[in-house]
Amino acid sequence: MFAAAGVAAQAEEFVMATGQQGGSWYPVGGAIKAIVEREHPDITITVTPGAGVSNVVGVDAGRFAIAFANSISTVDSLTGKEPFRKPTTNVCNLGILYPQYFQIVALADSNIKTVADMKGKGLTTQQLGNTGEFLTRELLSTAGLTYDDLSSVAHTSYSDSASQMKDGHADFFTLGSSLPTGSVMDLASSRKITLVDVDPETFKHFKDQNAAFQLREVKAGAYPGFDETVHAISYDTHMVAPCDYNGDTIKAVLSAIADNPDSFAAISKTMANLTVEEMATDIGIPFHPAAKEFYAERGVAGME
């Protein structure tokens, strides 16, 4: 559980749930921890690995004070849509950090160019409770496929997935992360890879379920040896907290992000030019009262 004491009044310790090692959430969380603890010695943050869906559930249940999440999952949580078992009632938005891309990485010699081509192939993906794993099942369904139609399915970390691909134990690897992703960079350094293009009809399947989905380009050169531009399903990484959580701590975390772009650019290039206006984008999830105050104090219009 987390403490809800004011940062100026007494020491505070809390848990911040991030993502799997080998992805971008975990190191970004580590950078936030370092900056906040440096600037506020009375705050101690424990950064723990997590997953998009389970992080939101954990915040709602009071297990995490702050957590990383995906916009699409958090929107679904408000109504209890699958994979959530019931609606969340105490989850508020803190701000957007950067876009996430649902990447479908295939070995070049696997001949996987469409979802239908995945039949009979080996998959490595995230564990249950991860947004990327849920999206993988949805992706397969667009071609009438399930996990039972694949030769093998592994639920593991990004780094272990990359190792399985290197060793030829899997043909394709699905994940939701920023661009570029370290584990995919590692894979591309030793195996020729392709990214499967998402066509408009496949994207419509996702967009019809959640308006927060976007179709964004992954440019040629995003990874070593990757020489064509493709389209990927995209959404946003943001941070959430219980709606009644300590406002001083919320502002300390948001200040750490907004005032130290260089610290985050080295981890995720897309955070290099992050502005408070972008952080304050309305994604259909209520803002924490302290987050609204923070953005209003920083001059963001419409936050009064």
Give the ranges of each region predicted by the language model:
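Sec/Tat signal peptide C-region and signal peptidase I cleavage site
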Residues: 2-11
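Extracytoplasmic
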Residues: 11, 40-42, 51-54, 61-64, ...
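Bilobed "Venus flytrap"/periplasmic-binding protein-like clamshell domains
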Residues: 13-39, 43, 100-167, 262, ...
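Extracytoplasmic small-molecule ligand-binding "clamshell" domains
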Residues: 27-28, 35-60, 226-227
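Acidic, polar ligand-binding/catalytic clefts
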Residues: 64-98, 178-181
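Pocket-lining segment of extracytoplasmic ligand-binding domains
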Residues: 71-73, 80-82, 108-110, 146-245
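Ligand-binding clefts/hinges and TM-proximal coupling segments of bilobed small-molecule sensing domains
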Residues: 122-138, 212-283
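An extracytoplasmic/periplasmic, membrane-proximal ligand-sensing/linker region
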Residues: 160, 166-168, 177-195, 207-208, ...
